[in-house]
Amino acid sequence: KDYKLTEDVMRKAGELGFLGVSVPEEYGGLGMGFVSTMLVCEYISGCTGSLSTAFGAHTGIGTMPIVLYGTEEQKKKYVPKLASGEHFGSYCLTEPTAGSDANSGKTKAVLSNDGKYYSISGQKMWISNAGFANIFIVFARIEDDKNITGFIVPNDPENGITLGEEENKLGIHSSSTRQVFFNNTKVPVENMLSERGNGFKIAMNSLNVGRIKLAAACLDAQKRVTKLGVQYANEREQFKTKIIDFEAIKEKIAQMATDSYVGESACYRASKDIEDRINIRHKSGNSFQDAELKGVEEYVIEC
């Protein structure tokens, strides 16, 4: 449960440029293509599950909502520090009564009388990176709007933000996972992401972009488990025979290798198709945001 180690390694990853692989160069990132970012996700996941989770939560849903939906001012203000690892991002969507039904969240955002800021109040749970995040992407409902709205919220304990204890998880013990409580947290109106009521769209599209990268993050673990299984089967003996020579073990290892190959093929075939569609849209004059979102949208089922 060494959360500080995860934070330190993440900061080092930022210094090496890994936290900005998906971020355009004009905002301090490397501007890599979709396939290259998938390869980085797979590579990083080979360290630990905790680092993989922290990395994915930061580079994906903790950063990309601003890259894809933020104003030019928001991107210039927040994205370079997120890409460098100076700041870390976290994504506050899930609530005690709003999981898969994300648009049913009860967190409220109330506009001040002078129209300069919103006061956000509510409870978020299972928030990855919450223990060391500097920036929260928060979703809240304004008045009785049908859909939630997204906000960029700096983590400031003096502004009504408190954290729950670290969750006692079955695995990924060094990945910070906490509840986040907002109590009349004041957020400037200029920190609204996109438009009022556009939060559910932002939330779902951000998850669409991140979902296939999560699959890539699982590939290295599949390969490592298969390799370890083969090694063990060649070492372990029963009935004076290495168990690798038993047909049942051969079948099991063959299935593991097949599953790894199929998963890898599906991930990189889909990611190359997405990259091709993004490039076509770029050449057609689409912005980075539109090209990225529309490219992923065309393969959302595969993702």
Model features per residue range: what roles?
Residues 159-186:
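Flexible, small-/acidic-enriched active-site or ligand-binding loops
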Residues 1-47, 56-57, 69-70, 74, ...:
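Alpha-helical interface subdomain recognition
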Residues 84-93:
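A short, Trp-centered hydrophobic/proline-enriched beta-strand micro-motif
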Residues 17, 41-45, 140-143, 153-158, ...:
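Short Ser/Thr-interspersed hydrophobic loop/turn segments at strand-loop and sheet-helix junctions
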Residues 96-106:
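Active-site-adjacent elements of ketosynthase-type condensing enzymes
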Residues 116-162:
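A short core secondary-structure module
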Residues 46-49, 98-99, 125-131:
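Glycine-rich phosphate/pyrophosphate-binding beta-alpha loops
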Residues 184-202:
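Long, acidic (Asp/Glu-rich), low-complexity accessory segments flanking structured domains
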